[in-house]
Regions:
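Class I S-adenosyl-L-methionine
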Residues: 1-118
């Protein structure tokens, strides 16, 4: 009974996976997102988002971004097998977010050895 409860606890507790390849420090250095037409002013680098997702979520987890912008977090989630819920109130950024997510999903499907139909 103890082992069952311990396993359940381990499954439910907040994940935090710091390791040699994903160190936890209070200073992060990531290249900024280079300017391009339509770039969101607060767009985060994919490397930084993947670092955050690797250290704080499990495979298949759901990630909520209440200020989704152009869905950089969502794109990282698609690439890392996380589910994504994004909220964006600015129509032009919402439209761009939808396009970026659709493109990321299409890319992931073609990258899979056995792409799901649909």
């Amino acid at each position: 009974e103890y082992e069952d409860l311990r396993r359940e606890y381990e499954d439910l507790r907040r994940p935090f996976f710091a390791s040699a390849d994903r160190p936890y420090t209070d200073t992060w250095t990531f290249d900024t997102v280079k300017p391009y037409p339509g770039k969101h002013p607060c767009e985060k680098p994919q490397d930084m988002l993947r670092h955050i997702l690797k250290t704080s979520t499990r495979d298949g987890a759901t990630v909520l971004d209440c200020f989704a912008g152009t869905a950089s977090t969502g794109v990282a989630c698609v690439k890392m097998n996380r589910r994504f819920i994004g909220i964006e109130m600015e129509p032009r950024y919402f439209d761009t977010a939808c396009q970026r997510l659709e493109q990321a999903v299409r890319h992931q499907r073609t990258a899979l050895p056995f792409a799901p139909k649909g």
